[in-house]
Amino acid sequence: MKLIVKMATRSRPEKFKTVLQQYIDFLSGENEVRFVITCDLDDETMNTDDMREWFEETRKSVDLVYRYGHSKTKVEACNADLEDEDGDVLLVVSDDMIPAAMNYDSIIAQGFAEVFPNYDGAIKFNDGLRNDALMTLPCLGWKLYKAIGHCYHPDYTSLYCDDEQTRLCGMLGKLAVCEMIIARHEWIPGDHENADDLHKRNESYYGVDGEVFRRRAENNFDVDEVRERLGLPVPAKS
């Protein structure tokens, strides 16, 4: 299995380095794994000579590419820099998704071999925080990812994008659930005493993104178009 691990980051260089190194250290060595990192050119904490040197040193021991761009939103950053990539599974992580299982790549490989051997589905792993069906750690077969056309729908800024992703995969009949925790979601609300400016900014979009979600839901999240791209039967319109 070839696993693409996508990570977008901003304004948290030390936390980012710690978490990324954990993702590297927790690999089994049994699968092909490539890390794709997206940073912002206007981020003075990440766009530094020291950070670039750290990236170059890390690249000596792992397949990793890092790119600096002009992402205007969290969703845009998550979607960025994947257009020239290819793999079997896409795993989208962040610096608040802390690795919790050694050999997580082999756990993912085994899961897809069991439920989506053609890599045309998604697996929702328990994130250690929520008990509902929401997939907060996107783990998408590459065929499904390409059929959808993005990780998160680009109309969103920060929030509700995972709600759409989860519902769309469920509507397609392409969502499996695994109670194993491969990464623990250490999320804190924007009003928490430890919340930084990025937390607060990302959580300020509830109203805007909530309206996007309602509008997208009225259109069934374009599920029929995705069905067609996957080669699934499309129900006749009444």
Regions inferred by a protein language model and the residue ranges of each:
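C-terminal catalytic/acceptor-binding lobe
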Residues: 159, 163-238
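Active-site nucleotide-sugar/metal-binding loop of Leloir-type enzymes
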Residues: 79-89
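A conserved acidic beta->alpha catalytic loop
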Residues: 37-51, 97-98
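Short beta-strand-to-loop acidic/aromatic patch adjacent to the donor-nucleotide binding site
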Residues: 87-98
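Conserved donor NDP-sugar-binding/catalytic core segment of glycosyltransferases
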Residues: 97-98, 102-135, 142
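Short, acidic, metal-binding catalytic loop of nucleotide-sugar glycosyltransferases
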Residues: 21-32
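Active-site beta-to-alpha loop of glycosyltransferases that engages the nucleotide-sugar donor
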Residues: 7-18, 41-43, 72
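Short beta-strand/loop segment that forms part of the nucleotide-sugar
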Residues: 31-44, 67-69
